[in-house]
Amino acid sequence: TPIPGGEAWLAAYDAAIADFVANRPVNVPADLPEGIRMLLIGLTNPVNQPFSGELWATDLMQTLRRIQQPVLVVIGKKDIQVDWQADGSLIAELAKTHPNIHVAFPENANHVLKYEPLERAQLNAAQASSSYNAKAPRLDDEALQAILAWLDARR
């Protein structure tokens, strides 16, 4: 089911990103949902622009194809910023022909690989990002084991 107003939100997002990529001032419309506004403000904040610009211009798949060293890509299934199915499946497919690339998809890891007890469907941007720097959440056990096993295999 389409989200009411979703097409207008996407058009405003696309326009803001086009301005950002072209190094023009970015106008973040006040009527966008808070999550989209915060994303755009964060990306286009002058202090973040060098990193954001480089990140935006990077083609991850091309970069992974060029890397010869061992690579571990860990995407938590409760990450609401990176889709483990959409993005992860592309990387997993590439890993089939690039033996230096390894992937792991821990069931309960969020974007920063911390344990997330809520179901994926219950997560929203504000709730998820507030837990990234919280003291209580711990590194997800499955994510940690994937990292340790990958490192151990390279001793």
Where are these regions (language model features)?
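Extracytoplasmic/secreted proteins, especially bacterial periplasmic and envelope-associated proteins
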Residues: 59-62, 66, 86-90, 142, ...
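Conserved alpha/beta-hydrolase "acid-adjacent" motif
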Residues: 80-89, 114
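Accessory cap/linker subdomain of secreted extracellular hydrolases
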Residues: 1-65
